[in-house]
UniProtKB/Swiss-Prot annotation:
Serine/threonine-protein kinase involved in the phosphorylation of the NAD(+)-dependent glutamate dehydrogenase GDH2. When overexpressed, confers hypersensitivity to rapamycin and induces rapid nuclear accumulation of GLN3 to activate the transcription of nitrogen-regulated genes. It comes from Saccharomyces cerevisiae (strain ATCC 204508 / S288c) (Baker's yeast). InterPro entries: CDPK_Ser/Thr_kinases (IPR050205), Kinase-like_dom_sf (IPR011009), Nnk1 (IPR016241), Prot_kinase_dom (IPR000719), Protein_kinase_ATP_BS (IPR017441), Ser/Thr_kinase_AS (IPR008271). Residues 13-29, 375-391, 769-813 have a biased composition (Low complexity). This is Nitrogen network kinase 1. Residues 1-12, 30-40, 86-107, 683-696 have a biased composition (Polar residues). Interacts with URE2 and GDH2. Also interacts with the TORC1 kinase complex. The lineage of its organism: Eukaryota, Fungi, Dikarya, Ascomycota, Saccharomycotina. The gene is NNK1. Belongs to the protein kinase superfamily. Ser/Thr protein kinase family. Its EC number is 2.7.11.1.
Length: 928
């Protein structure tokens, strides 16, 4: 028969409270079925366990009890036998309550608690084994087997759990623990046979080592023997300390020093070095050099003094020479050593510029200082430096360094500052090694300037920054290499021939030039500050996402375009067409307010002269000019234009190239007049990152003069003269294939001319492009048939609807007519219209990834006019549609296909000037 209990009653005793807490956790205890039997069961059990029963306790009336088991004979049976029999009534407990030894507890009054019976099986979700009478049960054997199984379980867990070795920080030894859980339950582990004695608790500083992990390496102990290493002195500190050597007490530097120098020490493990002891001694000037450097010196079997002697023999611009030249110089002076290792050492210690203070010279003349720093035991004892070192200090003064670490000094030695380069006055070529250096390499001297780094690239050449050897003023040199390519050489000569004649305050000046007949052309010019108009438009973004108001965008476009118009009018007055007008070729210099911004036209590689009677001249000159002597007429044209266009009054003497001039422009942005223009060494720096306009690649060279520089340079006014006065610039007309500078800016007549030259017509040498109409081909044929009727005394010319000009000499009706170039002022005006549109809208008017399609769009003049109208008519309702209307009409007039209807420069200037005046008036009214 089985009996069980559910819950002990709460009677306030500690034991009953413990029982109640156990019940709340879901654990039950075995007991009988009724309160009456509970009292009887507790009384008999106390007697069975040898507990004395009070005499005054009344006996229970079993007649009124419902129990079916009578325990008194069992007590008598136990008393009669020495050991319990197999029929013993036992109390089996679960492991959840290992401390339960009885089914009832004694209350403080000495009685037993009334216990409630458990519910029948099925009504309770959790039961334990209650008091049970099991016949033939050997309880002792059962308990022993249970204990043995528990021990086996713990042994299995200990073998499967990684053993953790814990270091006792107090005792310095290691102890084994079975698991992290065992660490927290230290008392329980003491009962296990596999644990070791440990009475100390863990601390956060204790280190843990898992022996069963893949890494069985013990922690690396910290070294006990270490040497003190000091940081090297800076140049300023070394120079300050070296000044104390002239005092009366040369053996005690710190006695005369009022400053306390803090020692920076670091403890590092002692490492063996293959360097001889002489290098590690305090007397050596290299006693705190990097170990790798000392090892290199040891491997090369060269002493520091020998290294200094070698450096003295090298040219002062050794690091600026090409690699092949440096190699030859090293082999010449040190043939028995590895030139690569020697070059590495020289790079580390040769420079004494502001970018590097870690040099042999600095260590040689501060040997006593380094000794004082390295010696910690005798800091007040110093050695007197020798006289030779003192002399070297006076000849090679140290400079303050901005870089403190050895690593940064070593890296900076590979890229010396341009200040030190500009101060080098010696010949860059020395000895037999000089023949291998190219004349355009970094560090070379050209036109009185020292070449610096490359800051731009072009179609055939590069742009290098340069510095005046005498003054240090920064400029740029355009280097175009031809090396036997006669076509490129002719192209460069043509550019210089035109550029040297252009002297205008809105044209980038050619300060000096030099021709190397077998190598390259060098063109010296100023350096402009703030990028190009292309950079400015990129900063504005497209009109839909414009970062500035439309009103300001239109005013700035007009203001900058009027300056460009001044340069174009001057060039056209000299019968010169630019041929490559675009945003990238308009340099921008920002000075203070926006009203002080200046535009400079550059890149004359596509420029050429055009005939005065050119049909594409677009009425650049006065119509009443006679067709007499060409030379006299050209001279009178310049005089006429100077009177007609007072804004182009800057024409200095050819003997000087004074880039500074006063200007009295009619158009202003906010102020009515400009201040005298004095460029301040034009240094370029574009602060914003660029994103390129989506346009096809062009065949022209990009702008090369707007790269950044370090600082503004002083004004340069000394005249320059070309180095080749006898250079023949005749017969340098551009090749027909080079008429198109940038395809998105090309005019329709240039494209048709290019298509006609690519064709192979037997009669006219004119075949139109695949996208041209048959009417254009017929018009070209009819135009050529009319050539025979022209006068024999003049050179006949005709213009077809397709924009192709044909001419034929007199009396040569049987000869094939040649095609006259359409490149003229009208082409520059078309490109100007493309520029205006791009500045206003923020994108090119003609743009397509497929080049044939782009050509077709340009020929038919198809572009987005609605976007242009949105920008130009930004406040049409408020101002009755007058503001921006002239700017819109100007762009449309410039982008007109019909040459007769395409606007002229004079009309463009008048309309834009009126727009500017009206905009300023409205701006002043709004401000007031």
């Amino acid at each position: 028969m089985f009996t069980s209990q559910r819950q002990l009653r709460q009677n306030g005793s500690p034991m009953s409270s413990s029982r109640s807490s156990q019940h709340s956790s879901g654990t039950a205890s075995p007991i009988s079925d009724s309160p009456a039997s509970n009292r009887s069961y507790g009384r008999d059990l106390r007697g069975l366990m040898g507990i004395d029963i009070p005499a005054n306790e009344p006996a229970f009336n079993r007649a009124n009890s419902s129990d079916t088991i009578y325990f008194r004979p069992k007590k008598i049976y136990k008393m009669e036998h020495e050991h319990p029999s197999r029929s013993t009534l036992v109390q089996l407990q679960t492991r959840s309550q290992p401390d339960d030894v009885a089914s009832s507890q004694v209350n403080p009054e000495g009685g037993t608690d009334d216990l409630e019976l458990g519910d029948p099986c099925g009504n309770q979700s959790l039961y334990t084994i209650g008091a049970e009478y099991v016949p033939d049960l050997d309880f002792t054997k059962l308990v022993n087997e249970w204990q043995k199984s528990t021990e086996d379980l713990y042994e299995f867990r200990s073998s499967a759990t990684p053993q953790v070795q814990i270091k006792d920080s107090g005792k310095g030894n290691y102890e084994l623990w079975s698991s992290p859980d065992a660490i927290l339950t230290q008392n329980k582990l003491r009962r296990d046979s596999f644990s070791q004695e440990n009475s100390d608790s863990l601390s956060p500083e204790d280190s843990i080592l898992s022996r069963n992990l893949h890494s069985k390496v013990k922690p690396i102990p910290l070294p006990r023997n270490s040497q003190q290493i000091f940081t090297p002195l800076s140049n300023l500190e070394a120079e300050r300390r070296s000044s104390y050597t002239t005092s009366s007490n040369n053996n005690s530097i710190t006695q005369n020093n009022k400053f306390s120098f803090a020692k920076l020490k670091y403890s590092l493990p002692t490492q063996s070095s293959a360097v001889p002891a002489s290098f590690d001694s305090n007397a050596s000037s290299l006693n705190f050099l990097p170990t790798t450097t000392l090892s290199t010196l040891s491997e090369l079997q060269i002493s520091p003094n020998d290294m200094m002697d070698l450096i003295q023999k090298l040219p002062r611009n050794f690091l600026n020479l090409p690699y092949t030249q440096r190699k030859k110089v090293i082999i010449e002076h040190a043939p028995s050593h590895d030139y690569k290792a020697m070059m590495s050492l020289v790079k580390k210690f040769m420079l004494t510029s502001s970018r590097s203070n870690f040099s042999l010279a600095g260590f040689a003349n501060n040997a006593s200082v380094s000794q004082a720093t390295a010696n910690d035991d005798n800091i007040n004892s110093r050695n007197t430096p020798n006289n030779s070192n003192d002399t070297y200090v006076n000849t090679r003064p140290l400079q303050r360094s901005r870089h403190g670490s050895i690593a940064s000094q070593f890296l900076s030695s590979f890229s010396p500052s341009m200040t030190s380069i500009a101060k080098m006055n010696s010949n860059p070529l020395s000895g037999s090694a000089g023949g291998s250096a190219r004349p355009d390499d970094k560090g070379m001297e050209i036109l009185g300037h020292r070449l610096g780094k490359i800051i731009g690239f072009g179609a055939w050449g590069i742009i290098r920054e340069c510095f005046d050897i005498e003054t240090g003023v920064g400029r740029v040199i355009k280097i175009v290499k031809f090396k036997g390519h006669q076509n490129i050489k002719k192209h460069v000569l043509r550019e210089v021939a035109i550029w040297r004649t252009l002297k205008h305050n809105r044209i980038l000046p050619l300060l000096d030039w030099k021709l190397d007949d077998n190598y390259a052309m060098y063109c010296l010019t100023e350096r402009i500050n703030d990028g190009t108009l292309y950079d400015l438009v990129i900063s504005w973004d497209e009109f839909k996402r414009s970062k500035i108001p439309f009103a300001e965008r239109c005013r700035l476009t007009i203001f900058l375009s009027l300056q460009l118009l001044s340069a174009l009018k001057y060039m056209h007055s000299k019968t010169i067409v630019h041929g490559d007008i675009k945003l990238e070729n308009c340099l921008l210099q920002k000075e203070g307010k926006k009203s002080d911004w200046k535009v400079f036209l550059c890149d004359f590689g596509m420029s050429c002269h055009f005939d005065e009677k050119h049909v594409y001249r677009n009425d650049t000159f006065d119509e009443n000019l006679s067709s007499g002597n060409s030379h006299r007429k050209r001279k009178s044209i310049e005089q006429t234009n100077l009177i007609k266009y007072p804004t182009t009054n800057f024409l200095p003497d050819d003997r000087t190239n004074d880039f500074d001039a006063s200007e009295n422009l009619k158009y202003q942005f906010e102020n009515r007049k400009h201040q005298p223009f004095t460029p301040k060494g034009m240094v370029s720096s574009s602060s914003h990152s660029l994103k390129h306009l989506n346009q096809p690649s062009s065949s022209s060279s990009s702008n090369l003069f707007h790269k950044p520089a370090s600082q503004p340079q002083p004004q340069h006014r000394s005249p320059f003269h070309g180095r080749h006065k006898t250079t023949d610039f005749s017969n340098l007309e551009p090749e027909p294939s080079k008429y198109i500078g940038s395809l998105p800016y090309a005019s329709p007549e240039l494209l048709r001319y290019s298509d006609a030259r690519r064709s192979k017509s037997v009669e006219m040498h004119i075949y139109d492009s695949p996208d041209s109409s048959q009417s254009e081909i017929s018009a070209a044929s009819s135009s050529s048939s009319n050539l025979s009727s022209l006068s024999s005394s003049t050179k006949a010319s005709a213009v077809t609807n397709s924009g192709v000009t044909t001419s034929s000499p007199s009396g040569s009706s049987t000869d094939f007519p040649c095609i006259v170039s359409p490149l003229g002022p009208a082409s520059d005006i078309w490109a100007l219209g493309v520029m205006l549109y791009t500045m206003l809208v923020g994108k090119l008017p003609f743009n397509h990834e497929f080049e044939p399609r782009l050509r077709s769009l340009i020929k038919v003049g198809e572009f987005d006019r609605f976007s242009l109208a949105q920008v130009c008519k930004f406040d049409r309702k408020k101002n009755e549609g007058t503001i921006g209307q002239g700017l819109y009409d100007t762009v449309i007039g410039c982008l007109t296909i019909d040459l007769d209807k395409r606007w002229k420069l004079k009309r463009i200037e008048e309309v834009l000037q009126n727009e500017m005046n009206l905009s300023e008036a409205i701006h002043d009214n709004n401000g007031s």
